[in-house]
Amino acid sequence: MKSISFDKVLALKQAVHDTFGVNVHFHDLCSHSAFSLDEPDERIRAFIIDYFKKQGDRAVFNAAGTEFTLE
């Protein structure tokens, strides 16, 4: 798991909100960045995976599809 800069967090939140009208919640943990969604949505999940893949990172979601971290 890894951390990302706050600028990148804001860019992700803006991109998801502009595209889907929902909020991504950011959780700054001591060792890494974590994120959550209010409800699972396969379209948003795919968007986030692709978004980070383009930046050379990998978003890993939990089984419920509501939380993810980066690798």
Protein language model features and the residues they cover:
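N-terminal acidic leader/helix
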Residues: 1-30
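Acidic-enriched, low-complexity/disordered segments with a strong bias for Aspartate over Glutamate
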Residues: 7, 18, 28, 38-41, ...
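Short glycine-rich, basic-tinged beta-strand/loop micro-motifs
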Residues: 22-40, 65-68
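Detector for the mature cores of small, proteolytically processed
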Residues: 40-71
